């Protein structure tokens, strides 16, 4: 990834917006394409004078999204900090429903041994968690319903916080269960459903679970800033694959045959380098469409994605959620840290969504 000179004071902070003749126009990064199809989201409309406020754009995106998930690429990525900012800062409108895939909210990270921020909720928040977690929080609880969803820590129940306080979460682990819990939240009066995603669960990008994804990354992922940025952008690209137009049923009858016959193929399982590279070498994959169920089914390297793009192969998905924002933490749990300004600037250069430093901008 190329280094770019930092903008002069007073210039736009976000690469997605440039001024031209007093108006704002969109600047599209080469990273915004896969197979020649632009899949970035429109950042903002021109609203007159003044400097573009990334926080305003972030709040707009969050408040227009009913179901969202927060996915961490590594430990200490700032996921809980972002979650607490959403839950308690008055930034999201209406009643919130909260659950987690896996356990979260404990005070110490069992992997790194570092102290973690607890999950703090406001009075009125709806929470779905396992029964064994109820004794660990300090909120006053009103049990609203049982779900019949089993976990190693007991059945998942839905409660309403009758006071502000800390909670610990252990929610469902299956997509259909998460969808069911979100639906229950809305039936009980929630305006928004938030899923605290487990580490590396890219499947939370599926439309069946969430409309939008908050991607959290940081220095704990790797000592190399270059690698952290490159891998984060790779995940961002996959999460933002364009939604596919409907394909005929016969488009699922074999990758090579369907591409030759229809110029498009529906890949029913995982899409891997082993499947794709031979077809690239043979010239079969050129100016065609490959459709997968959701981004979690794409197991391609960044290099292979670039090769598909060069051959004008459009990679699309039946179910997808857009990336709402990316949060970065320049401080690692393992003792190293990045230059915060360089890390933030380079990440903003590489993507077309708001990028927030959780250490400073969510205080």
Task: Name each model feature, range by range.
Residues 174, 178-350:
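Conserved catalytic-core segment of NTP-binding enzymes
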Residues 98-101, 289-296, 354-363:
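A generic structural motif
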Residues 67-73, 160-171:
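Short, basic, glycine/proline-bearing loop/turn elements
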Residues 60-64, 75, 91, 119, ...:
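Solvent-exposed alpha-helices and their adjacent loops that cap or buttress functional pockets
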Residues 55-92, 96-101:
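Walker A (P-loop) phosphate-binding motif
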Residues 15, 20-37, 43-45:
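Positively charged N-terminal leader segments that act as targeting/secretion signals
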Residues 3-18:
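Low-complexity basic/metal-binding stretches
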Residues 86-159:
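N-terminal phosphate/diphosphate-binding loop that engages ATP/GTP or pyrophosphate donors
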């Amino acid at each position: 990834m190329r280094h770019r000179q930092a903008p002069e004071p007073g210039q736009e902070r976000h690469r997605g917006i440039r001024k031209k003749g007093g108006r704002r126009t969109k600047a599209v990064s080469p990273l915004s394409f896969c197979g020649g199809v632009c899949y970035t989201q429109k950042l903002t409309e021109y609203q007159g004078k003044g400097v573009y406020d990334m926080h305003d754009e972030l709040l707009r995106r969050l408040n227009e999204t009913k179901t969202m998930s927060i996915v961490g690429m590594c430990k200490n990525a700032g996921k809980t900090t972002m979650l607490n900012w959403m839950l308690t800062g008055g930034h999201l409108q209406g009643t919130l429903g909260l659950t987690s895939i896996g356990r979260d909210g404990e005070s110490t990270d069992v992997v790194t041994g570092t102290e973690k921020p607890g999950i703090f909720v406001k009075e009125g928040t709806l929470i779905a968690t396992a029964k064994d977690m109820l004794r660990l929080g300090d909120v006053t609880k009103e049990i609203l319903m049982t779900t019949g969803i089993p976990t190693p820590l007991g059945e998942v129940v839905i409660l309403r916080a009758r006071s502000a306080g800390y909670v610990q979460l252990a929610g469902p682990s299956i997509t259909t269960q998460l969808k069911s819990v979100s639906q229950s939240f809305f039936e009980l009066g929630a305006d928004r459903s938030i899923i605290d995603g487990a580490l590396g669960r890219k499947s939370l990008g599926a439309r069946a679970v969430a409309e939008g994804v908050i991607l959290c990354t940081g220095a704990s992922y790797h000592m190399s800033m270059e690698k952290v940025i490159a891998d984060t952008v790779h995940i961002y690209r996959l999460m933002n694959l364009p939604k596919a137009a409907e394909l005929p049923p016969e488009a699922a009858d074999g990758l090579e045959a369907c591409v030759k016959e229809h110029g498009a193929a529906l890949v029913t399982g995982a899409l891997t380098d082993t499947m794709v590279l031979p077809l690239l070498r043979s010239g079969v994959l050129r100016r065609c469409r490959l459709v997968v169920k959701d981004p979690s089914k794409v197991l391609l390297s960044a290099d292979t994605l670039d090769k598909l793009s060069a051959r004008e192969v459009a990679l699309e998905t039946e179910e997808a959620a857009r990336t709402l924002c990316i949060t970065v933490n320049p401080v690692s749990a393992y003792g190293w840290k990045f230059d915060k300004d360089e890390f933030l600037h380079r990440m903003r250069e590489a993507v077309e969504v708001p990028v927030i430093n959780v250490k400073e901008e969510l205080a």
